[in-house]
Amino acid sequence: MTDTLDTTAPSVTYADGQGSSDVTVAVIGAGGKMGQRVSNNLAKSSYTTLYSEASPAGVELIESLGRSVTPTDEAVAAADVVILAVPDVVLGTVSEQVVPAMKSGAVILTLDPAAAYAGLLADRDDIHYAVAHPCHPSVFLERTTKEEWADTFGGVAAPQEV
């Protein structure tokens, strides 16, 4: 996995009506608890968003919101950013299916830092990996000291809003 900043990765802005329609985001697990939260925020942005869901109940929910469901393989192949909003226990398996189908230079974002830390994600040198959990916004806040930057798992050094 790469851990350096690559300025060629798609630019990402806040989901407050901003964003670029040139950036396509795929939400895998869009009908689940976390997928709904992520999808609802992306729906407020200008990003092209593709919603993928395996469960019939999740598909029904997505469609009830007026959103179309895209098959996972199609969503992943088209996406600049792939968000894995799936249960932690299947994250490794889903990443093994998704990562090989991603575009070179795309970003994969998981909502579980433990899976990445444990090396459970499929590895590919030509994509970028990121982790951000909606309940742990400290990774998005300004950090100034070396200790704050090193504290990405919710310890005491990083600023906390939760």
Which residues make up each language-model segment?
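A short, basic/flexible loop-to-alpha-helix module at the beginning of a structural domain
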Residues: 2-21
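Conserved glycine-rich cofactor-binding loop
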Residues: 31
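N-terminal Rossmann-fold NAD(P) dinucleotide-binding loop
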Residues: 35-36
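NAD(P)-binding Rossmann-fold cofactor-contacting core
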Residues: 44-65
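Short acidic low-complexity segments
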Residues: 66-79
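Rossmann-fold NAD(P) dinucleotide-binding segment
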Residues: 76-120
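Rossmann-fold dinucleotide-binding core
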Residues: 111-162
